Amino acid sequence: MIVGLGIDIAELSRIARAWERHGRRFAARVLHPAELACLPAAPVAFLAARFAAKEAAVKALGTGFSQGIGPRDIEVRPLPTGQPQLVLHGKAAARCAALGATATHVSLTHGRDTAAAVVVLER
C-alpha cells in the first residue's frame, strides 16, 4: 500500500547558477555527507537530480522541509547495479516510520534542461 508519493522537477540552469555562485558550499548544504563524497567534477546534473529527489521525498513524507527535516537528512545512494536507493536519516527516517512505510522507492532522470525525481513510500 502506498503511504506517500512525491514528484519534483529541478531546472539545471537554476542549479548551475547556485553552483557558480556558491560552489562546494551549496553542495554541502544540499547533499548528505556520503553524497558529497561522490560529487563528480561536472556536478550540475548530479546536484539537480538529488535536489529533485529530496524535494520529492519531503512531499511524500508530507512535511516539506520543516519539522526539523532538511536536505541532508535525505540521501540518494547508488546500488551496485547503479539503481538509486533512497536512504532517510534523522527526523526524515522517524517521519517515514510514523507513516508505517517499510519500503522507499526513488526514480531519477535528467535531460538537457531539467532533472526530475519520483519518490514512493510503501508499507
UniProtKB/Swiss-Prot annotation:
Mg(2+) binds at D8, E55. Its cofactor is Mg(2+). GO terms for biological process: fatty acid biosynthetic process. The keyword Calcium does not apply. Its EC number is 2.7.8.7. It catalyses: apo-[ACP] + CoA = holo-[ACP] + adenosine 3',5'-bisphosphate + H(+). Keywords: Cytoplasm, Fatty acid biosynthesis, Fatty acid metabolism, Lipid biosynthesis, Lipid metabolism, Magnesium, Metal-binding, Transferase. Its main location: cytoplasm. The keyword Lipid biosynthesis applies. Pfam families: ACPS (PF01648). GO terms for molecular function: holo-[acyl-carrier-protein] synthase activity; magnesium ion binding. It is found in: Cytoplasm. GO terms for cellular component: cytoplasm. Belongs to the P-Pant transferase superfamily. AcpS family. Transfers the 4'-phosphopantetheine moiety from coenzyme A to a Ser of acyl-carrier-protein. NCBIfam families: acpS, pantethn_trn, PRK14657.1. This is Holo-[acyl-carrier-protein] synthase. It comes from Nitratidesulfovibrio vulgaris (strain DSM 19637 / Miyazaki F) (Desulfovibrio vulgaris). The lineage of its organism: Bacteria, Pseudomonadati, Thermodesulfobacteriota, Desulfovibrionia, Desulfovibrionales. The gene is acpS.
